[in-house]
Amino acid sequence: DVERSRGLGDVYKRQIMSSEPGTITLVPTGPLTNIAMAVRLEPRIVRRVKEVVLMGGGYHVGNWSAVAEFNIKVDPESAHVVFNEDWPITMVGLDLTHQALCTPEVQAKINAIGTPLSAFASGLMDFFRKAYKDNQDFIDPPVHDPCTIAYLIDHSVVATRRCPVDVEIKGELTVGMTVADLRGPEPSAEECHTQVATKLDFDKFWDLIIDALKRIG
């Protein structure tokens, strides 16, 4: 049973605490409410989680405000909790996902697979192509969440930069901003537990996606 006031925090807590330490990677692709609640309910989960690879944030621009991305903006307090715990975090934000554009050439490869799933995926791209053009003036639609999984499958698909990251929760104009300190030399993993995704290997990424669509059939 899910207690309304705790959301899925209890579920996260039970699953992590009942698993071997270092065997669970959290891959949130939405607001971080449930993970923050789990941490508050059972702080020991932080040491048991292998890493957190999240889709959210951005160190240059936002999409829900000038500086804030939707997943962080809608619950910045929870994001602040998650980023300030001492577990390894990779932030796959808009700076990276806006490079994962479904160009007409990519969509043609998806269509060529010729399965119901590939037709469904292509239809989604048609919808998002129009939506992104109308609302954000993108020529081609970006895909966001798959970038996190691509990184986990093959780290070489996504280049990263280690740097301190925090979430603004008080600014009049900047609530929900993920503030990445990219100044100076890159710190070591021992010095800094957060890193941001910076550059996508476009061809390798779409090869992974198209291969997955073919495998699923």
Q: How would you name each of these model-derived features?
A:
Residues 43-49, 83-86:
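Short, conserved loop/helix-junction motifs that constitute active-site signature segments
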Residues 9-10, 33, 37, 53-56, ...:
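Active-site glycine-rich loop that binds ribose-phosphate moieties when present
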Residues 36-41, 63-68, 92-94, 101-107:
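A short secondary-structure junction signal
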Residues 73-75, 92-217:
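Conformational coupling and interaction surfaces
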Residues 54-55, 90-94:
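Short, conserved beta-strand edge motifs with alternating hydrophobic and charged residues
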Residues 1-12:
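Single conserved hydrophobic/aromatic residue that forms the stacking wall/gate
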Residues 30, 82, 149:
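Divalent metal-coordination and catalytic microenvironments
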